[in-house]
């Protein structure tokens, strides 16, 4: 079951002006590594966007460390990628 590592309190705005609250989620894969992705929850109650896998780390501690280093610019790019994944999969 996925776990939330970090919830960011400052929203990231999409190109259409919607404010999204990012969070870093992750889970253990079949061979014991941890994969993590970003989810973006819109403040308007719309669909939560999810990026593709953003990192693979050997353990939970390293996922937390990675998440703690994410910058606003990285989160903005990840939101763009999450929008692209959503549209490519026929949502939104």
Which residue stretches match the model-derived regions?
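Phenylalanine-focused residue identity feature
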Residues: 5-8, 40, 74
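Negatively charged, low-complexity tracts enriched in Asp/Glu with abundant Ser/Thr
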Residues: 1-19
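A short, structured beta-strand/loop element
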Residues: 20-54
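Weak global preference for isoleucine
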Residues: 9-12, 31, 56
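Mixed-charge, Lys/Arg-enriched low-complexity segments
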Residues: 45-92
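Alpha-helical structural elements
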Residues: 3, 15, 29-35, 61
